[in-house]
Amino acid sequence: VLALQATGFLREHYREPISIHDLSDHLSYSPSQLTRSFTRAVGTPPIRYLASWRLHEAKRLLISEGLDVAEACYEVGYSSIGTFSRRFTRDVGLPPAALRRSADWLAEVSLPPVSLLRPTTTRVRVRVVVPSTLREQLGTEPYQWVGTFPTPMPCGPPCTGTLRRGLVEVLLPVAPGAPWLQVALIPGGADVTEHLAPREPLVARPHRLSDHDDVVAVEVGPARPWEHPMLVALPALWPG
């Protein structure tokens, strides 16, 4: 309940200069207690979550609303275009202007299979499980993204990853320092916004891989309302 209330407040007021004290006053928690409980439930501290949500909204404004970089920067609460662009590039995987260009060509093409791999001694076979109740909304041949990240949050380009059409088993290298497995499914008929700034993706809960994992089965489901947004613009894996 706390995570839902806190993230709801942050999503509603993301344009404002919110501090941890503003959030703790709103929820009647001490800042330290709120930070601990929030981080345990969401996987990241409240102010870091707020920063991520601002960037997620900026993606949508750049793609769907046609705002330029400066307009999107100020609309989501930043006062410095340089700071906004640096953080956007770090967490989304490409600069804001490049994301707008990506949206233009992605709207006219069908993404081919992509592999972002590197030589490693460890590999894991990943099987994606989709409940029967969700298969219809995915349509035929959904886009299946599987990748490894340094943290449970899908920020920045994955260390290793693949894009495939349809639900297929993949053999994925696991690089040192990137043990977190992330999986997302995008419907086959999704528009460009759903590819680059998905509102309600089907995702698996972050899974920490161990040295003993040979085969991992992960079940996907709708992202929970308080979960961290999927910041990385996954089609940036494709060089175009």
Indicate where each model-derived feature is located:
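Terminal helix-turn-helix DNA-binding modules in bacterial transcription factors
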Residues: 8, 17, 41-75, 106-118
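…primarily DNA-binding HTH/wHTH and HhH modules…
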Residues: 1, 89-134, 159
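Exposed aromatic-hydrophobic patches
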Residues: 166-175, 217-218
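Short, ordered, surface-exposed loop/turn motifs in non-cytosolic proteins
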Residues: 133-152
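Basic/polar phosphate-binding segments, predominantly the helix-turn-helix DNA-binding elements
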Residues: 17-50, 75-95
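Structured interaction patches on ligand/partner-binding surfaces of diverse proteins
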Residues: 188-225
